[in-house]
Every structure is written in C-alpha cells, then in structure tokens.
C-alpha cells in the first residue's frame, strides 16, 4: 500500500478507528482508545539452517521447530507447519514430521531451508534422550541467509555398548523409519506389517532381512505384528518369510465376519522355527492366550507402552510365578503425534560382538536390557549389570 493510504477498522458497521499506513509502517503499531493496529509481518528471509553436533562439529540429524514470538509456525520447506493429529493421521501423513502438543517438528539430516520472519524467532531442536534439548530465541536480521545452531550430547550409551531400539512401529516406510530414527538417535526400528480389517499395511516393505542405512547409523527391519482381538497380539521380530495369516478372527483386526483360523501359539512357533524373536506387546491386553504362551515358553520378552499399574501388576504376577521375562519398550506408533522411540529398549551387546540386528535380538532375548521413556539408567546389584539373573 502507498504510505498515504488509510486503514479503516470497523465492527458491524461501527467505525473503531482509522490509521495512516505510512505511520503504521514507521512505528509498527498505532492505537487509540478503541483499537490497536499492528504490523505482525515485518518481512521474511529464505534462511539455510544447519544444526551442528557440538562434539563432532558436523551436521547432525534431529527434529526442529521454528515459530514467531506470537506463535506462528514456520516449517522448513517441504514440511507441514501444523500436522493434523489426535488420531487424524492414523495410517496417513506419517513420516518426515511429528507433532508434540501444539508444536510440529520437521525431521532433518542436520540441514534445512525455508522462510523465516525477520525479527525474533523461537527455535526448538531435539534429538532423542541423549542430547540436551535446545530452545533459543534469536533474531533474523534483514538480508540474513544462514543460521547455525549447536546441540550437545550429555551421555553416550553406545559408548557403553547399549544400543536403543523401538520394538513396535507401524505405517512408516523403510526410508521414513531411517530418517525418523536418526532424528531421534535411535539405533533399531522394528517396522511392523499388520492387518486392519480389509486393510493390509506395509506389505511392500517386507524383504526378510534388515535394512541398514548407508551411514550405518540405523537399522530398520520390516517384520510383523500378528493380532487376534480376544486372544491377544504378538510382535514377531526378525522374520525371514511371512507368518500367515497376519490376523484372524474377524472384528477390525482381520476380515470382517472372518473365522478364527489359527492361534497365537502357532504364530509363535512359526516365528521361532525361522530364528525369530517373540514379543508380547502392550502387556496385558488383549489377555486370553498370553498366560498359555508364557507358561509354555513361547514368549521371549514382554513390551511396555506405559507404566500403568494394570500392566505393572500383570508383569509381576508372572515374575512371582517364576517366569523370567525381559522387558522391552515400544511405542506402537501409528500416528504423527508419536515420535519413534518415545518408549525404547536399550540392549547391551558385549565389546567383542558386533552391533547388528541379530545380536541386538539375541541379547534382548537374554534380558540384557532396560526400557525408558526418557530417563537413562545406570546401576549394578552386587556388581552385576542390568539384566543379570
């Protein structure tokens, strides 16, 4: 607008005030006793952002969120400013970004670019549990084209031979799982095929062996969660060929009106026959066949999603009956409001053995694990490490 222009503000035909545009541009805001006019967009710059690991001096994968001081989000180009969620992204719009509360984050390889407003900008950067989260208020100056941020690792579990993984992830692509895993400093993702009525998910991802990122920083294994809505669910890790049918017994987990064609015990045996690992997910629900599976030695570990007292009590019932069951952490991620590895399993692999998927599962079965939703645990009992029996 020309500097001589007049901005008129009305409410239901009632004149609240008039402001000269030139004065508003000069002062930023003009007010009277009835209305205040303020310029909230002072212009914008296309900014190239790099996030640096403080220890290595190199760009580091992470998740990042930009917003103005008034709360307006500015996503890096190619990402969503606001990710629809609250189960609105079940099975769709999954991968590349994540929403936590009201903030949508972009997963980046350490670099990104896009429009940022001139003036004060708030930036949030995070990377899993082992890096200090960063929140900074900074200024984007006219003409600025570059921004460098630094994050610092506060502990290094891999240096102590603990490797993290999520046992329970749905709907991501294999490459999307690598991207999100590295952004969350997660070493292993178990990407689970399954069935939801007439919908089959991730069929095309199954290859029967692990996918290792080109930089060796993450492993994704597309495997299965087999489900029956009353008998229970099973996570079958490390499958070399499918265990069919994936789901059985109708409802919304198999074909509508379908019959019960198999049991969890059969699925567990078929997994074990090919060297796989059997996890009882989100203990204790559904809860008809798990007791049989545990009593007959068909379960290698049980998975926590939360620390709800119901699951806690159920787990201790089995311990008190003499069944030694390793605990693992998995998210059951199905939407864009759950970051991969929000609940994760740390598995100890000895110095003389390579970190790979087979060894990760081997030592998971052995119980050399702890699970976490954020805290990092270091303890011994009579000199024995976590997982000793």
Model-derived segments and spans:
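C-terminal functional module detector
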Residues: 1-38, 46, 52-114, 120-156, ...
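Short linear motifs in intrinsically disordered
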Residues: 38-41, 224-225
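Conserved beta-strand and immediately adjacent loop positions that scaffold enzyme active sites
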Residues: 48, 63-64, 168, 233
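Glycine- and small hydrophobic-enriched segments that form the cores of compact globular domains
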Residues: 84-86, 94, 106-115, 194, ...
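Catalytic cores of extracellular degradative/oxidative enzymes
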Residues: 159-327, 331-337
